[in-house]
Amino acid sequence: SYPFCWRCDTPLIYYARESWYIKMTDVKDKLIKNNNTVQWYPESIGKGRFGDWLENVQDWAVSRNRYWGTPLNIWECECGHRHAIGSIAELKEMSGTCPDDIELHRPYVDQVTITCPHCGKEMHRVPEVIDCWFDSGSMPFAQHHYPFENKELFESQFPADFISEAVDQTRGWFYSLLAISTLLFDKAPFKNVLVQGLVQDENGQKMSKSKGNAVDPMEALQKFGADPLRWYFYTNSAPWLPSRFHEKAVVEGQKKFFSTLWNTYAFFVMYANIVNFDPTQHRLEDCKLTVMDKWLLSRLNTTVKAVDDNLSAYKVPEAARALQDFVDEMSNWYVRRSRPRFWAQAESDDRTAAFMTLYTALVSTAKVAAPMAPFMSEEIYRNLVCSVDKSAPESVHLCLYPAYEESRVDKQLEAEMDEVLQVVTLGRAARNLSNLKNRQPLQALYTDANSGLGQLYTDIIKQELNVKDVQFLTDMSQFTAYTFKPQLKLLGKKLGKRLNDARQALQELDGSAAKKELDATGVLQLSLPDGDIALTAEELLIETAQKEGYTSVSDRGVTVVLDTALTEELIREGFVREIISKLQTMRKEAGFNVTDHIQVYCQGSEKVQQVLEENQEAILHDVLGDACHFDALEGYTAQQDVNGETVTFGVKRV
């Protein structure tokens, strides 16, 4: 018949007590009117949960029978007269016992009496203190000691542009702010409210220390860092939805965004240091930009605008995901495609354009990410900017948000590159299905993607997917094998004894030609011994299978087919690429610098030795090798599996 505390299971007994009230029912219509001027995120909370609360508003029991708290500013006389004191000056004016340095808390303020203007007797402060939510609701003006001072400062900041709290504050802070502001100013104290959902455990249960499913925030910060923890909440779901916290998702965000951004930054720093690149000595406007440079700068500015627009609309996940997508494309597409330009030893316009493009993108990314990932953004900014430009703001958080440069945006270029990316992604998926590494060259790729893509894009697809040829087709059915069978439930009665003849005729069909005929005319003509018949698609069972030697993958209306047949020449090229990959890995394992030249040693498989000997020039060029030796092993050695062939390589710094 009575509730229990959900934390300690103590019985909660209600006692009826006298209380001081604010008659909120008298301003109900004003509360509703002012709430309608606020932009709520989501709107359903403002119009629904909070709106319903206002529709059924009750008078506010504002007093508490406690010792700690703001003393209720009402003095009472035994004659029945009551007076609300409005300032220290008024209290001193009406009292002969008020010290100059009065402390406005119990017990000191309780010792101050005032003279009753009606009967002349002493008036004493009532014993109650004020509901702490009244203190919270007074924050907009109390923080500035308004109206006693800072009038202009208060008016410049009121109403607030934005506040945010958990959904349970519809009856707490959101309400107390609106209630007091309506009583005093007859307007809402805020323009925008972003409501936050509660954080739950990974199973969707409320976190509780007693249940043992609570996560210590400080431990999580120590384990993951502040930035990844913040990023998880930004990208996980809309802020107002309950959020299931689990460590795997935080780690995934670390890898997907922070590791990717940091590795891209580290790549730039490493090669910039190697060639002593100084961004203050160049201007992006003077650079001869390639298509890849123009694409990255276009995507950068599209992202700057997308993040700005989404944050302005309080769409936090959309803003964070837009930035995350850009970082992924910058790293896994632009840097991947442009690596050789950064490796170039000789200074050139092309190398300068690559460095300036990536530098611009990284600095702008740090500025855009600063509100969401403040610590990593600061580290990147200070090293990239402050270390070379002493006149720059000393912190990324003192910088202006990057300006959107519409002149840099090329929507057609972005659309075309997006289509190329889609083809490459589908091609990689097809390789995975066929269990073929990207280092193994293939003869051809076929796709029904936009045939208007120019030679530049075709070359990119060839290089990325390691194929010799790319063909754009309108009809991809030639790579699918179609077989036809009779739909027995329908054709059994219709054909009777002729059913076996129809089955035999269907088995002998050219599947691709039959499918085209059916698609074009809606019927399939069959010649039987006793005459022709026409069958509809509903009367047929049509089975599809990929033709042998081809692998296809489709998504978003685009199909990609790989010719997976391997000739001896393709296999040999695959060996060359595999050898290069193994040697590059060994360079890294041996701790060599990217500029170090090496000697290469090889013993073991005759096939691998033959491939290495026949392709020495190309292999040594890619691994910075000066010579190849087959009579001994020196330096750092490791046994390797090269496409099923066992061989031992050695790499030695020159």
Predicted features and spans:
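Active-site "lid/cap" and pocket-lining segments within catalytic core domains
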Residues: 1-55
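N-terminal beta-alpha "docking/capping" segments at the starts of catalytic domains
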Residues: 12-21, 131, 136-137, 141
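Residues forming anionic-ligand binding surfaces in small-molecule and nucleic-acid pockets
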Residues: 25-47, 156-157, 305, 553-569
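Short, solvent-exposed helix-loop connector elements
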Residues: 41-45, 242-250
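Feature 926 captures the class I aminoacyl-tRNA synthetase adenylation module centered on the KMSKS loop
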Residues: 52, 56-134, 138-140, 146, ...
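A short glycine/serine-rich beta->alpha loop
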Residues: 157-168
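Structured mid-domain segments that build the active-site/substrate or prosthetic-cofactor binding neighborhood
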Residues: 235
